[in-house]
Amino acid sequence: MGNCHTVGPNEALVVSGGCCGSDYKQYVFGGWAWAWWCISDTQRISLEIMTLQPRCEDVETAEGVALTVTGVAQVKIMTEKELLAVACEQFLGKSVQDIKNVVLQTLEGHLRSILGTLTVEQIYQDRDQFAKLVREVAAPDVGRMGIEILSFTIKDVYDKVDYLSSLGKTQTAVVQRDADIGVAEAERDAGIREAECKKEMLDVKFMADTKIADSKRAFELQKSAFSEEVNIKTAEAQLAYELQGAREQQKIRQEEIEIEVVQRKKQIAVEAQEILRTDKELIATVRCPAEAEAHRIQQIAEGEKVKQVLLAQAEAEKIRKIGEAEAAVIEARGKAEAERMKLKAEAYQKYGDAAKMALVLDALPRIAAKIAAPLTKVDEIVVLSGDNSKVTSEVNRLLAELPASVHALTGVDLSKIPLIKKATGAQV
């Protein structure tokens, strides 16, 4: 009889022995195997990763500088059947620590040998290359043990004579110098670039300001053009409004003038009727005293004259202000005045001597007043004459000289008036 043994993927099961002196060995990992009682042997070996920390103290480099180097290595037993068999031959029955010690000693030996061939700068500055070189040199040796180096890295490198620190200071100084130079060059380039950027910014700003000014100027010009156009349209509208208003006022004034013309025509007609009525009244009252009739006619004539003068002055002022529109009124008024004067002249001509006598009688009181004006200051008149006939002759002489005086003052020849002619003739 026997047992069925199982194993996980992190271990390898080795079954050896058997009946009839068999030397067959079975290597199983991550599976199971059958082992006979008493005649089969089963052992296990770990396939897990083993972490090693090789350390080489005071190992002289190619330049004779003693360095201490520490590293970290990850190793494991390989699972290929041949290599697993090799590993089992060498490490089966040993603990993991024993296996780690064997591999560690191997790695440290190779690490020491490689340190002796390199300079401090090569080791310190290119640790990856150093670790790669150790891995490449040690891999064949540990591979013959069935061990695989998964990774190897240099953990630390230092010395006890401050060689690395001095090297670091020199390098630091070089780096600091290069950094200062780089900073200065960067600042120089930054200053140049900043100046260029400022120049570009100012150029852009000036271009933008120029475009803004051009846009503003174009806006102002367009605004002025619009304002000018609006002002022109407003002025045209205002002018059209004023012209239309003037036309309307002219029409209104024309209508007023026409109304005034009609009124004047009616007034002329009324005056003509008045003249006819006066004519009839004169015919009806021809026997009335000539003095009263003449005085009335004179007063009417004087009032009409003053009235016509004032009307003519007012109309002349109107005509002057309203221009050609009043020309028709002047013409109508002239015609009306001429018609009135014509009618009046016809009336005077019709009445003949009676009308002239009325004018003379109307003028005689004023003439007498002018002649007698100096006598208003005389208190009394004494006629010195012893003969009454002489006084009479003096009166007759004055009457005889009266027509000449009237003719000289008024231009009216009293000697041609029959009544006066008779009076003066009788005196003579």
UniProtKB/Swiss-Prot annotation:
InterPro entries: Band_7 (IPR001107), Band_7/SPFH_dom_sf (IPR036013), Flotillin_C (IPR031905), Flotillin_fam (IPR027705). A lipid is attached at C4, C19, C20 (S-palmitoyl cysteine). The modification Phosphoserine is found at S405. GO terms for molecular function: protease binding. Gene3D superfamilies: Band 7 domain. It is a peripheral membrane protein; Lipid-anchor. The keyword Phosphoprotein applies. A lipid is attached at G2 (N-myristoyl glycine). Heterooligomeric complex of flotillin-1 and flotillin-2 and caveolin-1 and caveolin-2. Interacts with ECPAS. May act as a scaffolding protein within caveolar membranes, functionally participating in formation of caveolae or caveolae-like vesicles. May be involved in epidermal cell adhesion and epidermal structure and function. This is Flotillin-2. The lineage of its organism: Eukaryota, Metazoa, Chordata, Craniata, Vertebrata. The gene is FLOT2.
